[in-house]
Design a protein with these regions (language model features):
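Charge-dense, helix-prone N-terminal extensions
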Residues: 1-18, 48-55, 61
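Basic/aromatic recognition patch in beta-strand/loop cores that engages polyanionic ligands
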Residues: 7, 11, 15-35, 39-41
Length: 63
């Protein structure tokens, strides 16, 4: 999955960018205060994308 597609999915579910690290972006779900880091790669493994969504407590993206 492309990183931009995952970020679009995260933003559509109400999460926001908390901060930028050197190699990761950190997102927060304001509904439940869950946090997750998203690596800065062009392609993100589908398993990792599902894991990030699970950490943020949002539905998994469609493949």
């Amino acid at each position: 999955m492309k990183r931009r597609d995952l970020l679009r999915h995260i933003w559509q579910h109400g999460c926001y960018l908390a901060r930028e690290g050197s190699r990761h972006s950190f997102f927060v779900n304001p509904n439940n205060n869950k946090k997750a880091s998203v690596p800065r790669h062009r392609e993100i493994n589908d398993y990792l994308a599902r894991r990030i969504c699970r950490d943020l407590d949002i539905p998994a993206p469609k493949a």
